Amino acid sequence: MRKKLIAGNWKSNGSLERNKALLEGIVNAKALGSVDVVVCPPFPYLQSVESAVSDSMIELGSQNCSATEDGAYTGEVSAKMCADMKCSWVILGHSERRALYAENDEVIACKVKRAVESGLAPILCVGETLADRESGRAEEVTLKQLDAVFMSVQPDDSWVVAYEPVWAIGTGKTASPEDAQSMHKALRNNIRKHFPQIADKIRILYGGSVKSSNAKELFSMPDVDGALVGGASLVSEEFVSIIEAAVE
């Protein structure tokens, strides 16, 4: 049985004061241990957040890493640097990175390779736009994004997939549990074609307006192994409720 994973993507939010209050409401959640929990703050807060969660069962993740190694790349943060900051995870391929910063499948595959080489576990985000879904291409587009990274990972690498339909991110809209399950099953079957030995072990998360009111129903689906949570991860009570829903 796959252990549920709940990852909080803070995006470009937070302050030292707000982060402290948020984490104080999460670190003692009773469900920690029964569920794997990751928080992914903005780069400037990695060190302070790591200090705040170091004695808890919460793991630290980065929201991104560079496709390059260390060197003359002004403004870039390498995977090695993230690992040096005690990150265990890194979010890659998020739709906001694809849309706002023109990251294509080739760039994302390179980032995945850098991440695993540095000992980070990628949370690979894939998902279709509303136009893709309405044209009947949702599965085609999503599986193509997954296909792009198979050359960057090995069966024994640690990584997870997060299905995030772009039309559901930050909109309040959520894919139905049945729609999520259908796509998660397709993703798992695609993994089976490349790495049959890990297809039933790898975790596939759902992301896209996940909140306490819909989490339990989503988690009841056989191929939904947790969530990548955006806005709701910024409210401790809401995030803890989602974590608890993953246990039930």
Curated annotation (Swiss-Prot):
Pathway: Carbohydrate biosynthesis; gluconeogenesis; Carbohydrate degradation; glycolysis; D-glyceraldehyde 3-phosphate from glycerone phosphate: step 1/1. It is found in: Cytoplasm. One of its GO terms (cellular component) is cytosol. The keyword Plastid does not apply. PROSITE patterns: TIM_1, TIM_2. Substrate binds at N9, W10, K11, G170, S209, G230, G231. Keywords: Cytoplasm, Gluconeogenesis, Glycolysis, Isomerase. The active site is at H94 (electrophile), E164 (proton acceptor). InterPro entries: Aldolase_TIM, TIM_sf, TrioseP_Isoase_bac/euk, Triosephosphate_isomerase, Triosephosphate_isomerase_AS. Its EC number is 5.3.1.1. It catalyses: D-glyceraldehyde 3-phosphate = dihydroxyacetone phosphate. Its main location: cytoplasm. One of its GO terms (biological process) is gluconeogenesis. The keyword Cytoplasm applies. GO terms for molecular function: triose-phosphate isomerase activity. NCBIfam families: tim (TIGR00419). Belongs to the triosephosphate isomerase family. PANTHER family: TRIOSEPHOSPHATE ISOMERASE (PTHR21139:SF42). Homodimer. This is Triosephosphate isomerase. It comes from Hahella chejuensis (strain KCTC 2396). The gene is tpiA.
